[in-house]
């Protein structure tokens, strides 16, 4: 059975292109999620969405000698660090259609595809990936002194901020014992981070504490652990996010 590009449906979510190959008469439905990394002009393919077992097989293969050698050589040939040959989008509500293990397309075409026992699916997957790459050639036009943020970078940044937000929204101020994000006034819904410890305070309470200590000639100590601090940083999150 030959690959037929007319059977492709294309959509996108959060910088991820979703290719759905639907061949109803032959009972074939294949979903391939692809991220194009414009920093190194390459593609990352979600093997979890192709078949969840492939991700487990890949992780096991990567630990073997053959897998380690292949990853080392691919990293050398592409100039991409081994840690950047794979990316993971975690499973959460907003990512339910695109989550999974994304790996460099070379690994899919030359390694993972051979683990698929259905030769028809093999053929269609190869055709689908090659068709997408052939029709989505991208050459960045950015000055040499400009840093380009890739789609992978954007997703990792969003995930990082979502994680810290989920923790922050439950945190209580160590002085007033109110949940910081639930404070009545919007300007109070910020954290005051001390440079000396990790205790949690809303910006209003810690500023009042700081001002009172200065007015009375007392030293600037954390209200909880009494460790001396020098600076208070206003932050929307309970900790600084780099």
From Swiss-Prot:
InterPro entries: E3_ubiquitin-prot_ligase_p28 (IPR016398), KilA/APSES_HTH (IPR018004), KilA_N (IPR017880), MKRN-like (IPR045072), Znf_RING (IPR001841), Znf_RING/FYVE/PHD (IPR013083), Znf_RING_CS (IPR017907). One of its GO terms (molecular function) is ubiquitin protein ligase activity. GO terms for biological process: protein polyubiquitination; symbiont-mediated perturbation of host apoptosis; symbiont-mediated perturbation of host ubiquitin-like protein modification. Its EC number is 2.3.2.27. Its main location: host cell. GO terms for cellular component: host cell cytoplasm. It catalyses: S-ubiquitinyl-[E2 ubiquitin-conjugating enzyme]-L-cysteine + [acceptor protein]-L-lysine = [E2 ubiquitin-conjugating enzyme]-L-cysteine + N(6)-ubiquitinyl-[acceptor protein]-L-lysine. It is found in: Host cytoplasm. A zinc finger (RING-type) spans 173-226. Keywords: Host cytoplasm, Host-virus interaction, Metal-binding, Modulation of host cell apoptosis by virus, Modulation of host ubiquitin pathway by viral E3 ligase, Modulation of host ubiquitin pathway by virus, Transferase, Ubl conjugation pathway, Zinc, Zinc-finger. Residues 21-131 form the KilA-N domain. Belongs to the orthopoxvirus OPG021 family. RING-finger E3 ubiquitin ligase which catalyzes the formation of both 'Lys-48'- and 'Lys-63'-linked polyubiquitin chains. Plays an important role in virulence by acting as an anti-apoptotic factor. PANTHER family: IP09428P-RELATED (PTHR11224:SF10), MAKORIN-RELATED (PTHR11224). This is Host range factor p28. The gene is OPG021.
